[in-house]
Amino acid sequence: MEENQITIVDEKGNEHLCEIIFTFDAEKFGKKSYVVFSPIGEVDEDGDQIYDAMAYEQNEEEGGTLLPIESEEEWEMVQEMFNTLADEQEAE
């Protein structure tokens, strides 16, 4: 597995190889780290790339543990970070 990829296991036990788009840390919700990713080769019904995000905790043995984003406020913060990055890339 490449360094900029992770494997996500969905609720049905299916594995999805995903490209890491970006990671960031935020103190607003208890000094959490977040990863925004996109399943490789998967698109929505309009043919657009799919994006998702999760919180994660770094650990030595496994490299990290993914955690669900717990609140609407937390999702809004992640969406704001994603939009800021997208705007910056669009401006380049």
From Swiss-Prot:
Pfam hit, one = DUF1292
Family note? Belongs to the UPF0473 family.
Report what the protein is called: UPF0473 protein BA_4613/GBAA_4613/BAS4281
Q: What is the scientific name of the source organism? A: Bacillus anthracis
